[in-house]
Curated annotation (Swiss-Prot):
This is Uncharacterized Nudix hydrolase NudL. Its EC number is 3.6.1.-. Keywords: Hydrolase, Magnesium, Manganese, Metal-binding. InterPro entries: CoAse, NUDIX_hydrolase-like_dom_sf, NUDIX_hydrolase_dom, NUDIX_hydrolase_NudL_CS. NCBIfam families: PRK10707.1 (NF007980). Probably mediates the hydrolysis of some nucleoside diphosphate derivatives. Belongs to the Nudix hydrolase family. PCD1 subfamily. Residues 29-120 form the Nudix hydrolase domain. It comes from Klebsiella aerogenes (Enterobacter aerogenes).
Length: 120
């Protein structure tokens, strides 16, 4: 019987990644970024968080670590890495960023850019 588990290279090849493209944010829409952290191991996995039920927005939701872009963030990738460090203690230097996915508009008025990276 064939092993149905994906190896890391096979897993990554299923993502259609884009190089970061400079773009102007849409009018009246705040920018946010999330890290899609792929855990490096024989059978790769994704790290997700669960937001506190006491949060004002998105309470109790399962999500990737991330959040709004700050003025101190040079790029969307920098924002995703900063938020991942703040939320789940992933040091930015330990993330191998492999690309970004197209931005998604959230129901709360953010344009969210997923940043895909491999973590130890």
């Amino acid at each position: 019987m064939a092993d149905s588990a994906l190896e890391l290279d096979d897993f990554l090849s299923r993502f259609q990644l884009l190089r970061p493209q400079p773009h102007a944010p849409p009018l009246n829409q705040r920018q946010a970024a999330v890290l899609v952290p792929i855990v490096r191991r024989p059978q790769p996995g994704l790290l997700l968080t669960q937001r506190s039920p006491l949060m004002r927005k998105h309470a109790g939701q399962v999500a990737f670590p991330g959040g709004a872009v700050d003025n101190s963030d040079a790029t969307l990738i920098a924002a995703a890495l900063r938020e991942a460090q703040e939320e789940v203690a992933i040091p930015p230097e330990s993330v191998e960023v492999i690309g970004v996915l197209p931005p998604v508009d959230s129901v709360t008025g953010f344009q969210v850019t997923p940043v895909v990276g491999i973590i130890p």
